[in-house]
A protein has these predicted regions:
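The catalytic core of metal-dependent phosphodiesterases that act on cyclic dinucleotides
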Residues: 111-179, 204-220, 226-232
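Extracytoplasmic/periplasmic sensor domains and loops in membrane signaling proteins
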Residues: 327-364
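A short beta-strand signature within small-molecule sensing/ligand-binding domains used
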Residues: 13-17, 361, 370-380
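Contiguous mid-protein beta-loop-alpha structural module that forms a pocket-lining wall or clamp
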Residues: 186-266
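Catalytic core of bacterial c-di-GMP phosphodiesterases, primarily the EAL and HD-GYP domains
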Residues: 62-133
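Intrinsically disordered, low-complexity terminal regulatory regions
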Residues: 2-7, 14-15, 51-58, 77-83, ...
Length: 404
């Protein structure tokens, strides 16, 4: 597709609209504006045109403005307060500053489209300009009521350290890498971290490129409020009924909720069974005063489910060696004596909780630093001063539904 063909045929440059659905209302809350070119037989995405740095900037800006104006004309025709998501290249945006992008928005503001309906989607991964200038401009747009969305999160090029500094309104997370439930745990952990970050800075999570129900369930489970992708609706020339997927989403979410409730109940039952088992084992071996001897007895009882045992005091200092299950036998790792683990997330909080409730705690799934496997840890109060930690093996988690 030649750039000049597009520039000399702007009449056939058109906006397409991809609906964005909400978790709380189960309906369309806005549209992302996407550029298309009609060549006489099919509609061709203008994405490659806009991202081709060999095409002069003024040409790309001109076509961008045509798509934007035609899209805003369409939004003027409908009497609904829908959000308008607009993509902009950070370099082009800054080189033109607020002219002509802001001029168009102000022009349509006078026609009835308030600035608080716009969401500017921007990716700064390949931005070559001064970050301070970009920050200043984006903050200025926010003072006008325009929302800022950081795009392309979930890619390797994501600058996660910049999110807190920019404090965007929306984090837009790409789920293309999560096309099956075999996607790496590391990728899923990064997305989970993004959901925590969004909560901390008061941003809304929007998950895009949802192409299958598994991705929708992941987005829902990880705090996604907005959803977008071919599984829900493809980009089209026309707007859709806001409630087009209301029944479908309600049905899907009911399944997600039922599955999650069952998973939570399973975890509760497993935690209770661990609690009862540990009460029996502690009572059985309570006469063993030396912790290494006590842990040695536990290895015989827990050989099929655990690979590491150790005991810490209430401040996180290890008061026993590790008993670690190697390839064929349990070994004592005395070098771990007196190490302190209070820096670990939730460590002291969990110690306090166990001391008050006098019950054990089953951790979330996490990747063990030393062996690299996904594991869980069951922590159990031996007294108000000392606490037992049992690292459960991946094989055990894999063999028990709901633990992974």
């Amino acid at each position: 597709m030649d750039a000049l063909d597009i520039l000399t045929d702007l009449e056939n440059v058109l906006p397409f609209f991809q609906p964005i659905f909400s978790a709380d209302e189960h309906q369309v809350i806005g549209y992302e504006v996407l550029g298309r070119y009609y060549d006489g037989s099919e509609y061709i995405s203008l994405g490659p045109f806009f991202h081709d740095s060999s095409i002069p900037e003024e040409y790309r800006t001109e076509v961008d403005q045509v798509v934007l104006k035609k899209a805003l004309d369409r939004f003027l025709e409908i009497d609904e307060h829908l959000l308008i998501f607009i993509n902009r290249d950070a370099d082009l945006l800054m080189k033109g500053a607020d002219d002509p992008f802001l001029e168009v928005l102000h022009e349509y503001e006078e026609l009835g489209l308030p600035l608080n309906r716009y969401v500017l989607e921007i990716s700064e991964a390949n931005y070559k300009g001064e970050l301070d200038q970009l920050d200043h401009f984006l903050n200025y747009l926010k003072t006008l009521g325009i929302k800022i969305a950081i795009d392309k999160l979930g890619h390797e090029s994501s600058h996660l350290d910049r999110i807190g500094q920019l404090s965007p309104n929306i984090l837009k997370v790409d789920l293309r890498a999560l096309r099956s439930n075999r996607a790496s745990q590391g990728f899923q952990d990064i997305l989970y971290s993004l959901s925590l970050l969004a909560r901390k800075i008061g941003a809304t999570l929007l998950f895009e490129n949802i192409e299958m129900v598994y991705q929708l369930q992941f987005a829902w489970k990880n705090g996604g409020r907005y959803y977008q992708g071919f599984y829900l609706h493809k980009p089209a020339k026309d707007f859709v009924e806001r409630t087009i997927l209301k029944d479908k989403l309600k049905e899907e979410f009911h399944r997600f909720i039922a599955y999650e409730k069952k998973r939570i109940e399973t975890l509760h039952q497993i935690t209770e069974s661990f609690q009862l088992r540990m009460q029996d084992l502690v009572s059985k071996y309570k006469k063993q005063e030396k912790y290494e001897e006590f842990l040695g007895s536990l290895t015989k009882e827990l050989d099929s489910i655990a690979f590491r045992l150790y005991i810490c005091d209430e401040d996180g200092f290890q008061v026993s060696p590790n008993l670690f299950k190697g390839d064929h036998e349990w070994v004592s790792q005395v070098e771990y004596m007196n190490k302190n683990w209070s820096w670990r997330p939730y460590f002291l909080e969990n110690i306090h909780k166990m001391r008050l409730e006098k019950k054990g705690i089953l951790s979330d799934v996490y990747s063990d630093i030393e062996i690299g496997d996904n594991i869980r840890t069951f922590s159990y109060p031996l007294s108000t001063k000392h606490y037992l930690f049992i690292d459960l093996s991946y094989a055990f988690l894999y063999d028990n539904d709901g633990l992974l």
